[in-house]
Amino acid sequence: MNPAHLLVLSAVCVSLLGAANIPPHPLNLKNFMEMIRYTIPCEKTWGEYADYGCYCGAGGSGRPIDALDRCCYVHDNCYGDAETKHKCNPKTQSYSYKLTKRTIICYGAAGTCGRIVCDCDRTAALCFGDSEYIERHKNIDTKRHCQ
């Protein structure tokens, strides 16, 4: 084998070994982020929705503080129903969808885990696009506001 080829092959193997220790983002999270980016105003990033209100982000408690937070509350409950009623794993479930003409189309047979999770994400992303983003509700003190 040519020494140059051996060097390239070694570099590829080393990089693959390093990449094996990097946990992948669940495919569904990537899909959901893409849906959000498609529906929200251009000046916002999907990350600005990750720690908003009482329900946007990890966990959730109390009453939603506004319409946007209610979108996250409904999304959390939708995922909960997908897990308990349909035995789906929403965070890792793959699904097919299309972004077109300012809407989102979910594919797959009704009642399948892929379709159920896609519908949860679609509904939330469209809700985000229709709801006002209130800056003071970002990074709120959840112990104080979300009881």
Curated annotation (Swiss-Prot):
Record GO biological process: arachidonate secretion; lipid catabolic process; phospholipid metabolic process
Protein's organism: Bungarus candidus (Malayan krait)
Stated family: Belongs to the phospholipase A2 family. Group I subfamily. D49 sub-subfamily.
Catalyses which reaction(s): a 1,2-diacyl-sn-glycero-3-phosphocholine + H2O = a 1-acyl-sn-glycero-3-phosphocholine + a fatty acid + H(+)
Keywords (A to Z) from UniProt: Calcium, Disulfide bond, Hydrolase, Lipid degradation, Lipid metabolism, Metal-binding, Neurotoxin, Presynaptic neurotoxin, Secreted, Signal, Toxin
Pro-piece positions: 20-27
Enzyme class: hydrolase
Cysteine pairs bridged by disulfides in the record: 54-146, 56-72, 71-127, 78-120, 88-113, 106-118
Protein name: Basic phospholipase A2 beta-bungarotoxin A4 chain
Organism placement in taxonomy: Eukaryota, Metazoa, Chordata, Craniata, Vertebrata
Function recorded in the entry: Snake venom phospholipase A2 (PLA2) that shows presynaptic neurotoxicity. The A chain has phospholipase activity. PLA2 catalyzes the calcium-dependent hydrolysis of the 2-acyl groups in 3-sn-phosphoglycerides.
Cofactor or coenzyme needed: Ca(2+)
EC number of the protein: 3.1.1.4
Tissue: Expressed by the venom gland.
Compartment annotation: Secreted
Alphabetical list of PANTHER family matching this protein: PHOSPHOLIPASE A2, PHOSPHOLIPASE A2 FAMILY MEMBER
Residues annotated to bind Ca(2+): 55, 57, 59, 76
